[in-house]
């Protein structure tokens, strides 16, 4: 039963987060998604998005207005990792989800693209999901519950890290393990 539950979670987590956003009238945002936009999402990108902006300057949305963010292959192009994670947390509602994919430093993909200016791997997310690591960056406000952080290896020795995180903004009891 546990194995099947895990399989179903991996298959449907993002769809369930999207449905929850719809039910609660929260936005669904695709950061940097103008090349391959996710259906039903508003795109925030440098050009050709629903909202065009420089993500290095922040996310131009109200606090707590977003239910789910898709951030596929974008955060490595943002100069300040702490700022973009802080902005993602700011715009997400309590219990809002972010689904991140980023080239990992465990492979060549993080280094080969000249537009990459920040570098990530599975451990990079600990500073926002684990209290003992958050202390190293004086992080007392950005809190995420970690549901999935893993790395897969693709062709040409390109490793991709996925992080599925849920924003914590209240002391509400939550399912699953919480380390922050």
Locate each region found by the language model:
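A conserved beta-strand element that flanks and buttresses the S-adenosyl-L-methionine
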Residues: 70
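S-adenosyl-L-methionine-dependent methyltransferase catalytic module, highlighting the catalytic core
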Residues: 79-83, 87, 93, 97-180
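Conserved class I S-adenosyl-L-methionine
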Residues: 26-32
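Hydrophobic adenine-recognition pocket in adenosine-nucleotide-binding enzymes
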Residues: 74
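Conserved alpha-helix/loop element of class I SAM-dependent methyltransferases that forms part
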Residues: 6-26
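Hydrophobic/aromatic residues located in beta-strands of well-ordered beta-sheets
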Residues: 28, 41, 98-100
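Adenosine-cofactor binding site in Rossmann-like domains, unifying the SAM/SAH pocket
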Residues: 35-62
